[in-house]
Amino acid sequence: QGPPGTGKTFAAARVITALLAAGKSIGIASNSHKAVSNLLEECGKAAQQSGAQLVGIKVGGEGREPLVQSNPGLRYVANTSDARGAYKGGVVGGTAWLFSRSEWAGELDFLFIDEAGQVSLANAVAIARCARNLILLGDQMQLEQPIQGAHPGDAGLSVLQYALKDTQASRPDQPVFHPVVPPDYGLFLGETRRMHPSVCRFISESMYEGRLHSHSDCARQRIELASGKTRLITREQGIVFSPVEHEGNVQQSDEEVERVMAIYTELLGRSYTTKEGTTRPLTLHDVLFIAPYNAQVRALQAALPQGARVGSVDKFQGQEAPVCILSLCSSYGEYGARGLAFILDRNRINVAISRAQCLAVVVADPRIDGAGSLAEMRLINLFCKLCST
């Protein structure tokens, strides 16, 4: 389990290259070719650092990607039907379309499933038979797999959710998952090299039972307060709540767009100290602008300079920036069809806030903290903790 910034891909690549050096046959699978190639690329770097080269095949996806060009021992195979004949040992990377084929049954020593929190249980069952050992890589506290339709029982869970389901606390209609993998079941990477301790503290206590901490270098990060010019942002690092009351907004708030623009203008050009200790002025590229709804994303894109990094949480998983500005955009009581459960979803809040290396700013209607039901109270508890951090 790799929480944000803990180096899950880095660690997995070192495990894989060690197994390859021991003569094991390895499969790497995920939902997308991009995820598979990303892990393979890190494996190539790890192999080169140890004086070896990555050997094997990458099946499907783009044949001219830099991955194949930078790893001479890695061959590209376009068609899944040709893969088994082309594989002569080492590593093989592909999606479920490859590993679910009958000719791969029992052929590998280990199968690594990356981003396992977004791989469906059905797909995992279909591909797992190709290997004698299965290793899941991911974090069940980040974005869940997209689901269409209704699925009975546990069929709608991802393979990681299924593996980490708390059977004692779960109800038939409400599954509960271990926020941290039990020590007798797997490995938890507990040190982030991304977040300043004041950002990490909220993420750790709210999502990971207090088990996540920052590397000591992360404490160097700070954004200098400009003398006499500070109005909205009064902290050099951490989480800042910027309240904006508005009425009748469901998926878009012009009031919040205006506030986000003011915050961005105030931060632009301020002196930012990195975790390496170097100092430079903040630029547009140093800020992520996140909103739950596409309507608010479009409104922010229209207001911000061209080239601004604007999107929903889904777009930015795996990315980072010195500053993250989250606009929740819904007025009190106006939560739309998805409701408050979508706006304040724990996993989405986790991903949004943990993109920030130094400073996270939450722009929202403060009256959201008025709950009307027990279920809403659980969500509001997280919101209140976020606002008071």
Predicted regions and their residues:
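Inter-Walker segment of RecA-like/P-loop motor cores
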Residues: 52-98
